[in-house]
Amino acid sequence: MNVCCVKIPACVRRFRTCQIGNVAVTDFSSTPLLDTIRTPADLRKLKVEQVRQVADELRLETIDAVSVTGGHFGAGLGVVELTTAIHYIFDTPRDRLIWDVGHQAYPHKILTGRRDRIRTLRTGGGLSGFTKRTESDYDPFGAAHSSTSISASLGMAVARDLSGGNNNVIAVIGDGAMSAGMAYEAMNNAGAMNSRLIVILNDNDMSIAPPVGAMSAYLSRLYSGKTYRSLREAAKQLGKHLPKMIADRAERVEEYSRGFMTNSGTLFEELGFYYVGPIDGHNLDHLLPVLKNVRDMENGPILVHVVTQKGKGYPPAEAAADKYHAVVKFDISTGAQSKSKPNAPSYQNVFGASLVKEAEKDDKIVAITAAMPSGTGVDIFNNAFPERTFDVGIAEQHAVTFAAGLATEGFKPFCAIYSTFLQRGYDQVVHDVAIQSLPVRFAIDRAGLVGADGATHAGSFDNAFLGCLPNMVIMAAADEAELVHMVATQVAINDRPSAVRYPRGEGRGVEMPEVGVPLPIGKGRIVRQGSKIALLSFGTRLAECEKAADELAAHGLSTTIADARFMKPLDVDLALKLAREHDVLITIEEGSIGGFGSHVMQTLMDNGALDGGLVRVRSMILPDEFLDHDTPTAMYARAGLDAKGIVAKVFEALGKDVNTETVKLA
């Protein structure tokens, strides 16, 4: 068997990926220290001067692993030294370590007993791309949505205090996640409770404060050291015996003098945190002593401000952090990602381009995104209309109410948010938008199952949680051409809120319209006429319905296919017609219980369509469980929402066994 080794650039020298047959394997001989580490306990046995080499090898292993699997890349490279230092200084998993979001957790997984599976990241049956409680004791709290770490950590710290424990609780949160209100709610609560909690702010965009080199490192060691803290505590005790005005002023002088010297931290001090930093997050000579001092502090809460660089140690990622935030498989030597040429435009790009065309005719159209401009297609709109584009940061609650405010003044806001993230702004959808019937347009991306990001990012519930709201128009695009028309439809809806949902990924490659044409509200369409079976689809499962209908035809079952287009208002006439004229009616959607199928069933019951027992009705929905990551195709097959599953459901409704009917799908 031939072994051909790929030449690796200097940035990852001493490390090789080899091809043995069709299998990519790693030459672990180039990571001698990392090879000795199965858990952080092994890391803590090493001499402090060896920690630098471990970090270097950990970075190489991370680069090689992600080049094979794809995944979130830049953030993980940015915290290699920090991850190594935390596990070296703290007694994990006894000391609880909570990573916010989890994008940066790959090096953490390698150090915590999962190196042998690191090349299964985000694949079916493999490691999650985020932290996950069921995966490891070193993941005490699961994450994938941002800004939850401080709240969870505070809960753990309080539980420790109530139980009489003495372990540390550490939350690592990025500066981007600090744009969400939840982080400040937690910090405000933590400061008031004075519970011993360590928050490490990973500032990888330098958006809060720039590093200040050796002076900052010296001051951070000084202020986190025992001598300074003892003097500070003694001064506090003395202050209790002084008049309140004098004591308050003395405390302010101390806080602001530290803020002046360190060029940051006043906000965190005001929230009740003891601030340390900023520290160079790639300099272990700075990190290790500061973290040791912080570990030994008896009072809290404490915030350690660490400045890092996304993509650190891999030049292509350092040069283009945005392009290497998340990657597909790539060539280590060049950084080139192996992206296949798309057969059709992505839904997000169709949305962005369609909105641009509408905005060229209507200067009241504006676009809003919550820190996901490229993921939602809003970047396309921004290129054309930067003054009408608003990226509000990781702040979905604010995004929704901000859009509501724009709507009150006659503007036409399109709030483009992933389905999973719209959950974070649900009260605002109800209270600030729906109750007031404000015409906010929701563009709900990543509807349905999303693949490698798994359950945390699945758009499973928006049909259910929006469908119960009065006066809401809810659409789902069956293909990319339908999405163009639905964007135009939303522009025309000025008396109530509306939503259109569409999935991640490419469209079907259908012929695209030059311009969008508003659809009749609450009206579906017949795609194929049959007589025996009716398939009523809501969303992009329409393509699977067509495959299923072909198979059913081979078994003599003439099948009607209908595209509902609207869940609310539902096309009542269409639903009743399908129930009246067919033996079996099956609804298909990419959503949970309580969604489209529930609305159809309620309509049929209210209109007496089920009273005679002449039609057999079934709803095909996502299973009542959180599906683990896999490819979207595999996930939908597991859910039974593919052509094979639809055919099986038809035979089940007819009282026949699909296996005995020898159904074979192409």
Swiss-Prot record:
MF annotations from Gene Ontology: 1-deoxy-D-xylulose-5-phosphate synthase activity; magnesium ion binding; thiamine pyrophosphate binding
Catalytic activity of the protein: D-glyceraldehyde 3-phosphate + pyruvate + H(+) = 1-deoxy-D-xylulose 5-phosphate + CO2
Enzyme Commission no: 2.2.1.7
Pfam families in the cross-refs: DXP_synthase_N, Transket_pyr, Transketolase_C
Cofactor names: Mg(2+); thiamine diphosphate
Cofactor details (free text): Binds 1 Mg(2+) ion per subunit. Binds 1 thiamine pyrophosphate per subunit.
Keyword Transmembrane: no
InterPro entries in alphabetical order: Dxylulose-5-P_synthase (IPR005477), THDP-binding (IPR029061), Transketo_C/PFOR_II (IPR009014), Transketolase-like_Pyr-bd (IPR005475), Transketolase_BS (IPR020826), Transketolase_C (IPR033248), Transketolase_CS (IPR049557)
Keyword flag Metal-binding: yes
Pathway terms, separated by semicolons: Metabolic intermediate biosynthesis; 1-deoxy-D-xylulose 5-phosphate biosynthesis; 1-deoxy-D-xylulose 5-phosphate from D-glyceraldehyde 3-phosphate and pyruvate: step 1/1
Annotated positions binding Mg(2+): D175, N204
GO annotation terms (biological process): 1-deoxy-D-xylulose 5-phosphate biosynthetic process; glyceraldehyde-3-phosphate metabolic process; terpenoid biosynthetic process; thiamine biosynthetic process
SUPFAM superfamilies tied to this protein: Thiamin diphosphate-binding fold (THDP-binding), TK C-terminal domain-like
Binding positions for thiamine diphosphate per the UniProt entry: H103, A144, H145, S146, G176, A177, N204, Y314, E396
Alphabetical keyword list: Isoprene biosynthesis, Magnesium, Metal-binding, Thiamine biosynthesis, Thiamine pyrophosphate, Transferase
UniProt function note: Catalyzes the acyloin condensation reaction between C atoms 2 and 3 of pyruvate and glyceraldehyde 3-phosphate to yield 1-deoxy-D-xylulose-5-phosphate (DXP).
Subunit field text: Homodimer.
Family: Belongs to the transketolase family. DXPS subfamily.
HAMAP family in UniProt: DXP_synth
Stated name of the protein: 1-deoxy-D-xylulose-5-phosphate synthase
Organism: Nitrobacter winogradskyi (strain ATCC 25391 / DSM 10237 / CIP 104748 / NCIMB 11846 / Nb-255)
UniProt lineage: Bacteria, Pseudomonadati, Pseudomonadota, Alphaproteobacteria, Hyphomicrobiales
